[in-house]
Structure formats: structure tokens, C-alpha cells
Amino acid sequence: ILSFVFACLLALSAVSAAPEPRWKVFKKIEKMGRNIRDGIVKAGPAIEVLGSAKALGK
């Protein structure tokens, strides 16, 4: 499920917005998607550490 969401965010961020003012909403959505994608990328190592710690605890 996460990989599907990540692929959608990549596709959303790859769309280039036109310089017209009515595309401002799409630029905001693109920026939000970029922030979410960056957050997922930064959280990856922490999730791996938690998973390995949980495995060691068993």
C-alpha cells in the first residue's frame, strides 16, 4: 500500500504546472506531495531500526 501511495506522489510531483494563476492550486498540491514524499523517505531508516529492534526483542 505504501509503495502505491509513493508511486502516486511521484507521479503527482512529476507533473509540471503552467504559469497561469489558476494552476496555483495544483502547485500547492504538488508541494504538499513533495513534503509527504520527503517525510516518508526520511522516516524509512527509523522504521527499519524499529523493525530490527522488535525482531531482536522476540
Curated annotation (Swiss-Prot):
Domain of life: Eukaryota
GO CC term, one of those recorded: extracellular region
Disulphide connectivity of cysteines: none
Main location group: secreted
GO biological process: antibacterial humoral response; defense response to Gram-positive bacterium; innate immune response
Cleavable signal peptide: 1-21
Keywords, alphabetical: Antibiotic, Antimicrobial, Immunity, Innate immunity, Secreted, Signal
Induction comment: Induced as part of the humoral response to a bacterial invasion. Transcripts appear within the immunized fat body.
Localization annotation: Secreted
UniProt function note: Cecropins have lytic and antibacterial activity against several Gram-positive and Gram-negative bacteria.
Family from the record: Belongs to the cecropin family.
Protein name, as recorded: Cecropin-B
Species of origin: Spodoptera litura
Encoding gene per record: CECB
